[in-house]
Amino acid sequence: AVLRWFSMACFSVLPIAVFFKNRAVRNVAITFCVAVTIAQIACFAQYLDCFTSAAGKGLNSLPVSEGFRAFLINPAFRAVWFAIIIVLQLTIPIILAINENHLFKYNDKIEWRNYFIALPLVILASIPVYVPQYLFGQTDVILSAYSWLHFLWIFLLFGTLAALYFGFRKQSSEVKMVVLFVLALSLLMQYNQMFGAISLNIKRLPLQLCNLGAYLITLSLITKNKKIFNFTVIINVVGVLFAIAKPDLEGKGFFYYYNMHFIFEHSNVLIVPILALLFGIFPRLDKFALRDCLIGFTIYFLSVFALGTMFNAIASATGKGIYEANFLFMFLPDVAIKMIPFTKALFDINFKIGYATFYPILQLIVYAIFILVCVLLYYCFRLIYLIKDKIVLKRAALAQSENIQSGNNLIENDGASGENNEEQSSEVEGEK
């Protein structure tokens, strides 16, 4: 489990080392990542046992033919796939060392300091969702809504955001981008692990807002597309706020892998876009940001409304639960009512067309609530900007006033000095 964890850290480090000439990241790539890759080769037999086991979930839960499933866990295919990954993990550090002439400066204390800052942060950020359960078990401490663990997570979430901001705010833009990419790639990896750790079905598709955010956040950082970012930062913060207020938990032990998925995903979906704003990677949210968000959410809502209705109709027609969808929690009454009991009355207002079921009042309310909260959040951002600008102006005015006062004092001192000199000159002349 620890080796798989470290290999996930390589997944974050190596792409960043290619596109950023950051010495700390490249030092991790040519040392830590090479060591991990060699260890993976040495443990190939154990890897192959895991890859080809029919006892796991993930690939074995796919609704595909037995022949195709057998191909996916075929030892020869998995060995080739493993070899491709290993070659890539070794090729990148070799190219960095030879073509880029990158070598670790072992005599440089700053090099070591930055290395031991970067390495633990990368390892901690990239922890797979299943590793805590593997190492410690689920534990007897239950993570449930409004429990002390729930509030501890909220505290750590905002504490981590503050620590990252104050820890890196004075660093260069390159370092800030490296931090954001480490978090974004870790988020992407941790979400995709759900397909292997749990199952791959319609519910697991990245069409819930926070699941989609795992991809859009990375895309916005790569493309620097302001419209994608505007949509992502507002709508995903709204999504996380809803998740914090009404967490979708299963009442299992704290380290249960779905709990880890829930915590890791919603933490990074909030932290990465907010940090990007605070670091100045993207400009302030202007009047067009709300427009981009509302247009983007409307397109998203209509898309998941159509897809959710279609998939649930297929599930009803075939009797196969794998096709059930519950995007925005507005399709499956049992799940939504368990989380929010008063929605039962809204689900009771429905009609059918063939196998498709529609809940018009509930679905319109969901749309309206998201739009309202997005608007409120946007104006909260604007209010924060206004308060910050007033503080900056006040400090600037105070500094200017102090400079003027210092200048006046200097002039007065010069004047007094001049008068003293004149008096001394007069006294000397009188004595003569």
Question: Residue locations for each model-derived region?
Answer:
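Membrane-interface helix caps and helix-loop-helix hairpins in membrane proteins
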Residues: 195-204, 223-226, 248-260
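Aromatic-anchored segments of alpha-helical transmembrane domains
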Residues: 35-45, 122-130, 185-194, 236-248, ...
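Membrane-interfacial loop-to-transmembrane alpha-helix junctions, especially the N-terminal start
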Residues: 23-33, 111-115, 171-183, 227-233, ...
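A conserved mid-domain beta-alpha-beta active-site/ligand-binding segment of alpha/beta enzyme cores
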Residues: 274-315, 347
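Alpha-helical transmembrane segments and their cytosolic membrane-interface
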Residues: 108-192
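Membrane-interfacial, low-structure loops and terminal tails that flank and connect transmembrane helices
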Residues: 99-114, 392-412
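Membrane-interface transmembrane-helix boundary segments in multi-pass integral membrane proteins
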Residues: 66-87, 140-154, 290-294, 314-377
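Hydrophobic cores of alpha-helical transmembrane segments in multi-pass inner/ER membrane proteins
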Residues: 6-15, 78-97, 152-164, 211-221, ...
